[in-house]
């Protein structure tokens, strides 16, 4: 392992011990904000510290085994060779783990997120599939112990959604779901298809980090156009008699957010503003990322949500992720919320790309 990496790890361990000491300080315990911030830092440092301590122990074990390999006793030498092999394997594995733990963290990864699903090409079937995707993500959120809440929805006439936005609340929700952004294509025989022909339709998914109040961008009232209207259900029928639904247009960027799920206009406006802020910040981050990663592929997809990332093929029972050439034949399980087998390989590929970029930059 490089000396520069070892120095960085030693610094992190020192900070871990310092934070551990501070958490026992009565002044810190009495200051809720400070205690919360230090507790979070402590939990972030704990994993890398424990891993580095295991690495150091493996190095000590290797040195001891190499000494033992020089013994006169043949049985001791054989035992030493076995211990040397085990220690070297542990060092290699822990080195890889430490490199991943030291990769730059996306500051948004720990945050809640907004999940936006829009029906694309494919008519009624696209709307039905948008509903299927929302159910899939809801099931996945349930397995993770996250809470999912519909912020805004526009139901399709034959089931599902024309478009919908949900808030996913839970530890690391954005970091896990951010790779879901992009085009999702479905190939199946629609329930209305009498000839048994397979149809292709598509939906787009966008995942945006929820922005904490302290980090919200300044949005001037003069830059907003706010319209109120009556909430409507599937087929356009009005579902209440007051103008409680809200449409907010951010004039400088042309970003539009609608919210009509609450009966209160005030609540709909608050929800719409939260989504608007997330969209504005996301667009700016995507613009910056595009500037620095023209040459390197970006598994997070581009601002163009039509980038096809995944195909769900019902006749073959398969799901394919086009970004990493992965195909699994577990469609039913995936649609029931078993997404980890699709998410983990993309995260691993992203980490491999980050490691390659670090190696290129020395």
UniProtKB/Swiss-Prot annotation:
GO terms for molecular function: translation release factor activity, codon specific. InterPro entries: PCRF, Pep_chain_release_fac_I, Pep_chain_release_fac_I_sf, Prokaryotic/Mito_RF, RF-1. The modification N5-methylglutamine is found at residue 237. The keyword rRNA-binding does not apply. GO terms for cellular component: cytoplasm. Methylated by PrmC. Methylation increases the termination efficiency of RF1. It is found in: Cytoplasm. SMART domains: PCRF. Transmembrane segments: none annotated. The gene is prfA. Pfam families: PCRF, RF-1. Its main location: cytoplasm. This is Peptide chain release factor 1. Peptide chain release factor 1 directs the termination of translation in response to the peptide chain termination codons UAG and UAA. Keywords: Cytoplasm, Methylation, Protein biosynthesis.
């Amino acid at each position: 392992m490089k000396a520069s990496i070892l120095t960085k790890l030693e610094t992190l361990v020192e900070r871990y011990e310092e934070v551990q000491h501070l958490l026992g300080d009565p002044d810190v315990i009495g200051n809720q904000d400070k205690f919360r911030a230090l507790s979070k830092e402590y939990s972030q440092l704990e994993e890398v510290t424990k891993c580095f301590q295991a690495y150091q122990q493996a190095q000590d074990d290797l040195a001891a085994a190499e000494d033992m390999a020089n013994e006169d006793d043949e049985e001791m030498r054989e035992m030493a060779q076995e211990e040397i092999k085990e220690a070297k394997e542990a060092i290699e594995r822990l080195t890889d783990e430490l490199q991943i733990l030291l990769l730059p963290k996306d500051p948004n990864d720990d945050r809640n997120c907004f999940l936006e699903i829009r029906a694309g090409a494919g008519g009624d079937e696209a709307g039905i599939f948008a509903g299927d995707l929302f159910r899939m993500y809801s099931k996945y959120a349930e397995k993770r112990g996250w809470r999912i809440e519909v912020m805004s929805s526009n139901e399709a006439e034959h089931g599902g959604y024309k478009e919908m936005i949900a808030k996913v609340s839970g530890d690391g929700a954005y970091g896990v779901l951010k790779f879901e952004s992009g085009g999702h294509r479905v190939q199946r025989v629609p329930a209305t298809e009498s000839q048994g022909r397979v149809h292709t339709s598509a939906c787009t998914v966008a995942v945006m980090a929820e922005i904490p109040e302290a980090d919200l961008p300044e949005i001037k009232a003069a830059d907003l156009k706010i319209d109120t209207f009556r909430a409507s259900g599937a087929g356009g029928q009005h579902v209440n008699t007051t103008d409680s639904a809200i449409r907010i247009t951010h004039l400088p960027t042309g970003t539009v957010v609608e919210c009509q799920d609450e009966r209160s206009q005030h609540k709909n406006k608050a929800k719409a503003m939260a989504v608007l802020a997330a969209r504005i910040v996301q667009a700016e981050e995507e613009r910056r990322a595009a500037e620095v990663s023209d040459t390197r592929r970006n598994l997070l997809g581009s601002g163009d949500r039509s980038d096809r990332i995944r195909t769900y093929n019902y006749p073959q029972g398969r799901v394919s992720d086009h970004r990493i050439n992965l195909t699994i034949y577990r469609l039913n399980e995936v649609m029931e919320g078993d997404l980890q087998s699709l998410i983990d390989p993309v995260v691993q590929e992203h980490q491999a790309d980050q490691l390659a970029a670090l190696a290129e930059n020395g």
